[in-house]
């Protein structure tokens, strides 16, 4: 059996499969189905400084080979996360990644500060949120704001910092390089692609927010391309996500240069998808004579 262990920013993962934020809650529901200690890690539901009720419904709809969502970061707030959810995660036997979000720089800084001294292993910085003070544009769509928010959070946090990049930019590698120079210990990509669906009978968008984030198998080729481009530019680890539904997708991400992967929307249609992907990676390595997963990272051979 090959060694599936990976190291990202000093954090050891028993295997390279992490559940993606927003698709796994805080793990309790899935723990009723299987042993979640088998997972490499859990990136928790996006957490903000204060409780958020989320957007009004409808806020999820299906698309061909995917879904659109505008849930709006519904969550109990960081203090409730530490008090009510973290104790369960501490017993889960896997890496705990806190995904944090906010609408202003000071929100991010205060949220991450409240996670210092806790059992959280790593911070994942969601910079796809709108920056209210700058007119509502996403923190992740401007190099200047990526640099500013990454630097501020890095200074405030005692934990390794992974910055989650939005694909809704002209050049994602520029944002990755800026995050790296501002102190990010790793980057994860991609977050959702902005999309829209209209009901032709009512002439209204299917989502109450009009637009939403698209995820699922349809976005995989875009995510893979961006991971490949980013991994060739930065020196820090890259975690690949976006449309991974089967082990072959995960292997492609690893070959493209990802040190680990995150599985998200696939868990909605098959709760056991992350475990099947772990097993599939292991079988692929064994069948091809690899002794460790690190041997295939970045080994794609472009034409």
Residue ranges and their predicted role:
Residues 1-96, 102:
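N-terminal capping/small domains of soluble enzymes
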Residues 4, 17-20, 40-44, 96-100, ...:
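Hydrophobic faces of well-ordered beta-strands that scaffold small-molecule active sites
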Residues 11-14, 91-96, 156-161, 232-236, ...:
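Short, surface-exposed connector motifs at secondary-structure boundaries
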Residues 30-32, 55, 112, 200-201, ...:
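Short amphipathic alpha-helical segments
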Residues 31, 79-82, 86, 109, ...:
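Predominant activation on well-ordered alpha-helical scaffold segments within soluble catalytic domains
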Residues 46-73, 127-140, 192-202, 206-211, ...:
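Glycine-rich, proline-tolerant flexible connector loops at the mouths of alpha/beta enzymes
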Residues 103-239, 245-256:
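Alpha/beta enzyme core
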Residues 214-235, 239, 245-303:
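Alpha/beta catalytic cores of nucleotide-metabolism and tRNA/nucleoside-modifying enzymes
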